[in-house]
Amino acid sequence: MIFNCVDLLTTLVIRFLSVIIGVSKQLPPYVMRKIEMEMNAAIRYRRNFSKANTSVRCFKTNGVTTDVDVFLHGNHIASLDTATHKLTIKDGGWQSVTTKSRLNALLDEFAPSMGIFQKDWVWYLSDRLSGSVVPFISGMTV
């Protein structure tokens, strides 16, 4: 098996820093489900998407996609502002394993240094680059 040295070095550095700052719950590379890859592709290419419990809705103004919303079981869990590339993440009222997985897939695509993990039933948002960990608040923008 041939490894890309840069990718391997980056992964090792991030893992080392994560251990030092105590954030080892969600380390790269994040293993994404197929539906999450399809969800991210739909957002990337600004296409509506619906499969199983996940849907993506693109909103256009004058023919240009301005906002993209993501839903899980009909609950709004994320919005991407295509002009500013800011991602707003929400729990949709359900802090479930699936919600966390979908949000982590979105963060992996649009805010790669960020991740959500859970400790003692409480969700946290971590930034692996700065080392900061803050309690997750539904509606926060990254």
Model-derived segments and spans:
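Terminal leader/tail segments of proteins
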Residues: 5, 9, 13-142
